[in-house]
Amino acid sequence: MQIGAQFYTIRDFTKDLDGLSESLKKVADIGYKTVQISGTCDFDAEWMKEELRKNGLKCVITHTAPAKITGETEKVIADHKTFGCDRIGIGFYDVAKNGVQAFIDYYKDAAEKIKQAGLRLSYHNHDAEFVKIDGKLIMDHIIDAFAPDELCITLDTYWVQSGGGDPIWWLNRLKGRTPCVHFKDMAFTGKERHMAVVGEGNMNFDGIIKASVDNGVEYALVEQDNCYGEDPFDCLKRSYEYLKAQGLE
């Protein structure tokens, strides 16, 4: 299992191409070989291909705007193939508000086209997916509505726990369907929970790492939505060093 950097962590530094280019270099200098491109400025696919090449990086998944996934599916597929990325990610969809059927209707055709092109659509959870609709968790509704080769899950460990779920149980439940997982820790100050550098919070990352390996996770993508005034690159570095010490590459 390889350690990766989720660029949403450093989104404030990637608002233009110069910042994105510099951020790719800084992440590579930390030691990362794998990235998820998310929350950045727009870029040309050929430009990204070259930036990844010169920094020795591979993009294994993106978060792509929903309107592009469904309205410009062929272009999104072509762009991902250009810079060598096999997975097109959905960062957020308000299933609790819009309903499960609306989610299915919105993404089903795109999921099929992406599958036929040899890529995979992937859904990233937050905590709302652990609300029940008609006696069934939203996450289960989503999983059951799509075949594994139509939709994989970018399981976010922090948001699973925030929603009252057990990340290890869900890694077991989704065996073979979670090639990419977001590693994000949770800590508490008093009664207030907050996101933390991996290994510096309270989550059972020994167990999460073991379950990830046992269930075929390929990429552990470090994400920290909020660094609370700390340098996000330093947070990425500390998470990387912790995971390296646990035997990840």
Cite the ranges covered by each PLM segment.
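N-terminal pre-domain/capping segments
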Residues: M1-D86, L248-E249
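Hydrophobic faces of well-ordered beta-strands that scaffold small-molecule active sites
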Residues: I3-F7, V35-I37, C59-T64, I88-I90, ...
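Conserved, mostly hydrophobic/aromatic
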Residues: A5, V27, V35, L52, ...
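Acidic-and-aromatic substrate-binding clefts and catalytic sites of carbohydrate-active enzymes
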Residues: R11-L17, T34-W47, T64-T73, Y93-Q101, ...
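Structural motif
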Residues: D29-I30, F83, A117, G176, ...
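Alpha-helix-loop-beta-strand connector modules within alpha/beta enzyme cores
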Residues: M48-T64, A110-I114, D140-P148, F205
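Acidic/histidine-rich catalytic cores of soluble enzymes
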Residues: Q116-N202
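C-terminal helical cap(s) of enzyme catalytic domains, especially alpha/beta-barrels
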Residues: E230-E249
